Amino acid sequence: MNAGDLSTRATFQSPVQSRDDDGQVVQGWADEFTAWANIRYLRGTEAVMQARMQSRSPAILTIRSSAQARAVTSEWRAVIDGRVFEVREDPRPTPDRAFLEMLAEAI
């Protein structure tokens, strides 16, 4: 992987909890950082969810390794060109340790 292959901007978001006006806990998302990324789509699948077909679009996201990038967990998500990807695994370093790869799934 070369730095020039990172051609898409990805905003990584972590889950946050806050309280609404009624005091109820509300789940939301907070932007943590934005980085250049490469998306490599894997073979898509379909699954039956609640008696209807649901398509799945798994992909490998690659970003440059940094302290912020190493903080990403499988609870986070990435927003790329308005499309939301749930991070399915903690990032793992590439053999040269310059980049991190993670499995994500478009929702």
Give the positions of each predicted feature.
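Active-site-proximal polar cores
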Residues: 1-25
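Short, conserved turn/kink motifs that form compact alpha/beta structural patches or helix kinks used as
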Residues: 4, 24-107
